[in-house]
Amino acid sequence: MTTLGTPLSPSATRVLLLGSGELGKEVAIELQRFGVEVIAADRYANAPAMQVAHRSHVLDMLDPAALRVLIASERPHVIVPEIEAIHTETLVALEREQGQKVIPAARAARLTMDREGIRRLAAETLGLPTSPYRFVDTAADYREAIAAVGLPCVVKPVMSSSGKGQSTLRSEADIDAAWEYAQTGGRAGAGRCIVEGFIDFDYEITLLTVRHAGGTSYCDPIGHWQQDGDYRESWQPQPMSAAALRRSQEIAKAITDDLGGWGLFGVELFVKGDEVWFSEVSPRPHDTGLVTLVSQELSEFALHARAILGLPVGAEDGGVIGQSGPSASCALLAHGNGVPVFDNVADALRDPDTALRLFGKPRVDGHRRVGVTLARADSIDAAREKARVAAAALGIQLTA
């Protein structure tokens, strides 16, 4: 797709975002830089990407009939799934029946919508190294799986994100509460879970991998720290051995080649010395990749947009995307109930080479990531500290 039209005209190039969170918002902005007409959809009104789209729709994207009605009415040239909670079988059917273009491909969206499809592909079809695992449907199966993989272990709903429904079990005392949380915290309600054994790793990375018209290219590895299964900080580049980096790229290429299509993939990996294990992959920008807003010449969102549109990404097949030096991000979390209001913004931006993104999420109920601070420095440690200081300076209030 190297010919682009004018938005809101008969020549418009229309892209439908299924999911309108903060990652979708940045993708929408990058698409609009190329004059793309952006339509944003999500299950709630005024989602972040809706605030920068040409128009928006609120619907249950797990409802196949509602999804078909939306796609028929908007007639998008390209559909870009931005979350897992989509009836992906509808996308598969539309791709097959009508040639509907889905990014990166409808099969990739279906396989990665839950942990089972992608884990079985990686471990059982491609033979990639992973943690030991079992899939379970009942409390009895769950207890058998724990006995098989051993403690400590992790339990996650097969369909969830941002740590929802996820628990780490360190003793038998954790077993019942973890099962209950897994049955209530997933995106699709009670149901199937994965029980994963622990890997003794040194660190974990996200290797952003972009499949584009010119081949496959890689970003420098992103290190990250998670709490309760959710991203808190990320930094780039993560130091690692040449052998581990080479193996990481080999694993990323194997999984993304099988999924196919064009777009950016977030490949999550565990690393110990020169050894690498596959963890997960998302066929879209990754929350840990928010650091690329300041760390790269082209952010993960710009890369995704360019790949979607068939445009050059600034790196050759097998090459590495340009990087600007040690950089870090720190997530901003709000706790409570209400509409976020931010103060001390000037203080948060006082240090040079510090940036801030406020996502525009319309409401917080419980806890929610509402923004991110970003920083560059002479070292990873210094960049992380600058991002933390900026985050601590910002005040977050919730109003009725």
UniProtKB/Swiss-Prot annotation:
The keyword Metal-binding applies. GO terms for molecular function: ATP binding; magnesium ion binding; phosphoribosylglycinamide formyltransferase 2 activity; phosphoribosylglycinamide formyltransferase activity. It catalyses: N(1)-(5-phospho-beta-D-ribosyl)glycinamide + formate + ATP = N(2)-formyl-N(1)-(5-phospho-beta-D-ribosyl)glycinamide + ADP + phosphate + H(+). GO terms for biological process: 'de novo' IMP biosynthetic process. Its EC number is 6.3.1.21. N(1)-(5-phospho-beta-D-ribosyl)glycinamide binds at E22, L23, E82, D287, K361, R368, R369. ATP binds at R115, K156, S161, S162, G163, K164, G165, Q166, E196, G197, F198, I199, E204. Mg(2+) binds at E268, E280. GO terms for cellular component: cytosol. The keyword DNA-binding does not apply. InterPro entries: ATP-grasp (IPR011761), ATP-grasp_carboxylate-amine (IPR003135), ATP_grasp_subdomain_1 (IPR013815), PreATP-grasp_dom_sf (IPR016185), PurT (IPR005862), PurT/PurK_preATP-grasp (IPR054350), PurT_C (IPR048740), Rudment_hybrid_motif (IPR011054). Residues 120-309 form the ATP-grasp domain. Pathway: Purine metabolism; IMP biosynthesis via de novo pathway; N(2)-formyl-N(1)-(5-phospho-D-ribosyl)glycinamide from N(1)-(5-phospho-D-ribosyl)glycinamide (formate route): step 1/1. Keywords: ATP-binding, Ligase, Magnesium, Metal-binding, Nucleotide-binding, Purine biosynthesis. Belongs to the PurK/PurT family. Involved in the de novo purine biosynthesis. Catalyzes the transfer of formate to 5-phospho-ribosyl-glycinamide (GAR), producing 5-phospho-ribosyl-N-formylglycinamide (FGAR). Formate is provided by PurU via hydrolysis of 10-formyl-tetrahydrofolate. Homodimer. This is Formate-dependent phosphoribosylglycinamide formyltransferase. It comes from Xanthomonas oryzae pv. oryzae (strain PXO99A). The gene is purT.
